[in-house]
Amino acid sequence: MGKTKIYSVGFTVHEAQTLVTEKGQPVDPLVVVRCCGREYRTEIKYAKSNVVSWDESHTWTDLCLTDEEWETAYITFEVQAANAFWRNTLLGLVSVQLRLIQLRKTHQIRKALPLQHPDDTDVHGSLRVTVFACAPGEAPPSPGEEEVLEEEDHNDYDDLRKAVIDTNQVVEREAGSRLYHVYVTAYRVEDLPRSSKGARDPFVTCEFAGCKLKSTQARGCCSHTFNECFRFPVVTPLPEDAILIKIWDWNFMKADELIAVGRISFSELRTRQMVPRWFNLYGFDDEEVAQATKVAGQGGRLVANCYLGRILLGARAERLTKEDDLMPAHTVAARPYETPPVIPLAVLADVYEVQGAPGEKVSVEIWCGPARARTKWVTGLETKAAQRAGVAPQAFNRAMEGALGVASYLRGDIPEGEDRFPFDNTEGRVEDLRLVVPEDTKQQWDIIISLYVRGTTKGFMGDTRIAFQRLKMSKIPGHVHNNPRAPIWVPLISTPPFESVKPAPAILMVIEKSKVEAFARSKRKHVTAVGYQLRAYVYAARNLLSPSGALPNPFVQVACAGTSRETEVFEQTSSPVFMDCLLLDITMMTDPVSRLPTVAPIVVTLFEQRSWGIQFLGRATCHYDRLRGRLKPGESPTVAEPRWIKLRGGKYANRHLGDVLLLLELIRKRDAEIIPAFPMRPVVNMCNLTFSCLGVRSLYMTQRAKRLDYVSIRKGQDKKTELRRIRGPLLRISVSSYASAGRGNNEAILRYERNLPEDPTTVNKLWTTVTKAANADIFKVVNMEIDVPVDPIYDPRLVVQVYDRKQKPKYFIGEYSMSLVPLIPWVLDQQSAIEAVSPVNDFTDTVDLKHLGGLLRGFHGNSKNRGTGQIGLEALSAADRETADAHKEKTLAQSRFATYDPDNKTFSDSWLLPSGLPKILVSSYAVPGFRCDVIYTNMFTLNVYIPAKFVLFAEGKRAADKKTKEQYARPSVDSTLEQFLDDVIFPSDSLKKSVMGDIDVTGFVKFFVNLTHHEEPNPHVDSSAAEWASSEDRMRRHLRGEDAYPKLLKIRVYVIRAISLYVGDDRILPNPYLLFNLGDKSDTLRAEAKPNTHNPEFFTVWEKDVMFPDDSQFELQVWSAHEGTSGGLDDIFIGSTCIDLEERWFSKEWQKSMSKNQVPMEYRPLKQMPSGSFKGTVEMWVELMDFQKAGEVPKFDLQSPAATEVEIRVIVWGARNLNFKALGKDFVDAMIRCNLDCTGYRGSQPIAQQTDVHYYSKTGAAIFNWRMVYSRVVMPVSTCVLQIAAYDNRNMGESPFIGEVNLELRRYLERVASTLNSIDVDAELKLINRSRESADVSSFGFVQVSLQFISQSEATSKPVGLGREPPNRDPRLTTPQEGRKWEDVLGSAGLRVDYRPLWYWVRVAAVVFLSIWIFVVAFLYPSLLG
């Protein structure tokens, strides 16, 4: 289990096309994004068939994963159809491996990915997404780094058919796609550990290419034969490579337990198949897993220390030639496979001694696969000595000690104490482990050596494993009959939570293997105790950190075989020079035949002396196996060379807390007086060091043991910060002195003086910024005559310590330490020198140390007689040897591709170096200045970058494409501009202070250093800068004189946007706003907060007058506006970025870009603290100019893209040839529905609008004359899709879908927004329905529409109504008669009566009755009255 890290993953779901829906009907799609236990759901889009647009973004910036988990991490996009009363329907999914994205140059991918369905092999559409994945220290990609998609530029706006999104095309594979079937076969699992419920219920799952397959489930067993094959259809290219195999234990009424997980590389599987082989599973014990997770969460790295079983797997990839051969993912039965060839094997072990273990008794266990055996329990020498002397505690006292031990155990205290535990022949003999193992060494079990302790008085409840070691079976030596081996010391690894046990224990033992079934085990080898002298040459230490917050008072202790010696204590220094040879008289077991000793682990521990006692800082464990003896006649004496060793400290002994320069030497005690010690004093050259200090910036001082609370400082919470006022900075400059053994006078004190003694009118300013940070001008130069070792391995260091007034621990602010190796004038090869002084982990990792030959200039180039040499060191750890072999194999494999072509030698020599780098590129690094980047030319440490003076340009179509031009007509840099300015003479170097195990940046110091030898100019330093910076008067005139800068300047800050902001809680949407700090002035733009967005667009220009040096520190803060529960403000501080304006003003490169009005745009990271994690990125640039000439410098009109509003009017005239026969009907009740998907739509009209119904159309023709309006479409928009769909109307139930057409309207909107001229287009558009399309049916009808695009201002002056409502104009729409009559409505309902044949007789009858009525009224009625 590797240490956990914080990763950032973000994505944008753009759109989906050509979705395959059930029965071809429109659905309500959404996208569900899953990643590392997180889930995000997009908005549901309604009634979509083929094209769906989302444009939704989300970011997770707090994914806490180990290295192994990151290797297998995926982000999965599932397109689902939402259902109201049952489970959503899966339309398609795609997975992307995050590790592959993180390895890309821009850490992101933007692509249309094919959607797959687990039940078949067809492509179910495509999903266009943008995904980025960043490891710790990597900033999210800037918008300029996105992979721009090529789009055609349509200039014809009259033909609406060109805006149709063609979703009727057949979804095809990418060009160059290859088809595969991947077969992963799980044959058998064995030796699964028992759980709390007893036997296991195991099953196996396999995940790849968006599919997850599961085997059958076994019941109540720890070994089971599956013989099942997982088949996956794979089409390359594929955005994932890892095939995940997981072994689970089924649980009833709770989550299944994951036993083990493994991965197979698909790319390797394509080159060669994996024949069935055993994979051994290793993990952690159930009782230790909680502690292991805790340690990993705090940055610790753990090694699996328990055998959890094994699985027999086979895999292969089969290439297919036809797409018809591709079959869906499925689990099928596999033919049983014979077990790989096996051989008998026995593991033999004898334990001689255990050293450095706490507890009363110890026992050593050998664990190999399913077999394990232990030694007997042995009591330590201290307990035995107490028993023999009669001072052992009586029964009552022992009971009291036991009670105290139980209390310590319950409190969780770590047991302390060390003891030696010798084993005799009987106690140390481990029972033979007789096994049957695979013949292939890679499939054989590892051997786990565990150390168990017991002892209630020591705080151990029961048998407790405190340390272990895992060894490969192939590294175990073979057993030779009647020839016992000499024992060796095996270093152990502490188990959680015993990492803080002083040194890790070690075991002196013999472990062998025998492949003979019948053998006679001989007695273990007899070894005798012989006296030796261990000489530990402790030269120096560097970069030491004290958890107390003050400067450490360090000393080094070297311990071996129960003997220890210490150096003297050095006070208040982080880079002490000890120059001390510690002599340890030790007794070690020696083989009487070979006369070679068994060297016990050598523990080098760094402590600091405090007033209350001794505090642990760091430790390194060295394993040494060389013996220095007398010289033979004619043999030249051996020379020695020290090496820098890493020290590990912290709560779990996993943090790098400094380095120590060390050399070890072992000789026989009888030869100690004959063999002299190596001379430690190196050959030195006297040099002159010039230290020019400009001043200190942004200083903070807190209580000694209190951390600096940056967030509370930004919030102005003075009580929580507990800051102390800084009245007068004091600088202590010291340089390592090897000639005087660290006791020389290579140091100087610089005090802040407000007025110069020689000129009281000259004032050095001391001021405070708005964030309570102290700043001061020093302007002092000190010249020091120092001794510099000729050999750079000693790494002389310059240390700057800053105090407040007094040089006492409670006034300590921080320190800065730098190596002088890049400044040494006679060092010729800086690359090799820096590699030589880089620390190694410890001697266990040092299989082959590299010599420093060729580093020195002139007569020192090849002479090692005047300096030191090196004793080769070799590790005893089998794991380290294996790592070295693997590294060597990798080097040879890579070197095969780097072949030399002699034919190109003449041409390449003209402009290439032997390393392959262009000469002009390397020469550009020779810019004067000592803080230069060294070019590493080996294949593992290549760090070449393009300097600021180089311009890269593109040719061809991409260069002419307007999308590649900078949006704001200026260059840009991918990070901060300071990293690209190489002429800054006084850069800001961080002052650091260790508090409570963490490091705070407490300020910055600005200085210049020059190192000369024999008064010759230093080739690594700018000679022109050294001339004026070496004098206080010239430096003051250059930086504070009348011509240095105008009395009043003006700053312009252009902030475009922020990217991927994170407030620390996924449930909170930020409302970002900007806050500007300049000196003691602060301006907030809280009133302009952008609501509910992680990617706000500010488009803000901020101007302010600047007076140097008071306003030289500029800080841009980003906050999130929130209201508290009680009604007050409860804003959240997101992060800030700081710029030193003084550096930029005095940079000639920056002034040149400013004069051309081409200041680069920056993507500056936002952090809550200088050493914290990224909280986002801000896109901005800064201009600085003379106040009087500010009017001559044009101000860039930084405005957000004009929020032009456009209105869309859709007029549906009618339709023809609607294919209603596909619905099984003889007529159609036609209806047209429009749906707008647009990110910028802000209108009040509904997104979905529909026409009235044209009833009872037997020809498929329909007339509507219907207007739909979408007002207030705010520009710009990323996409705008209008869906026009035809339906067969149903008054009850869902209306059947006939066909649709989708239009991309973005370019029409952009044209109207830029020209403010309306666009009116007419077209007859073809309707499509992919689900019902066949060879006989290719057309589903046509719809006649008119689209009007009008600026909102014009549309407001000429409003229109929806449908045919008033105002009805432009054009006037009439109500059609067709399809609206009663007979049409009744005919649609099936109630239509055809009365046309009876119409003639109805009219005749009516005439007759009318005539009779007239006759009666005219003649009969008057006569009756008369």
Swiss-Prot record:
InterPro entries: C2_dom (IPR000008), C2_domain_sf (IPR035892), C2F_Ferlin (IPR037725), Ferlin (IPR037721). Keywords: Cytoplasmic vesicle, Exocytosis, Membrane, Repeat, Stress response, Transmembrane, Transmembrane helix. It is found in: Membrane; Inner membrane complex; Cytoplasmic vesicle, Secretory vesicle, Rhoptry. The chain crosses the membrane at residues 1404-1424. Residues 1-111, 161-279, 512-638, 1031-1154, 1189-1318 form the C2 domain. Residues 1366-1377 have a biased composition (Basic and acidic residues). The keyword Membrane applies. GO terms for biological process: plasma membrane organization; regulated exocytosis. SMART domains: C2. CDD domains: C2 (cd00030), C2F_Ferlin (cd08374). Its main location: membrane. Disruption phenotype: Conditional knockdown results in inability of parasites to form plaques in plaque assays after 7 and 14 days due to invasion defects. Impaired rhoptry secretion. No observable changes in the morphology or growth rate of intracellularly replicating parasites. No significant effect on the localization, morphology and apical anchoring of the rhoptries. One of its GO terms (cellular component) is cytoplasmic vesicle. Residues 1357-1377 are annotated as: Disordered. The keyword Nucleotide-binding does not apply. Regulates rhoptry secretion. Required for completing the lytic cycle. Required for host cell invasion. Not required for microneme secretion and conoid extrusion. Belongs to the ferlin family. PANTHER family: FER-1-LIKE (PTHR12546), SPERM VESICLE FUSION PROTEIN FER-1 (PTHR12546:SF33). This is Ferlin 2.
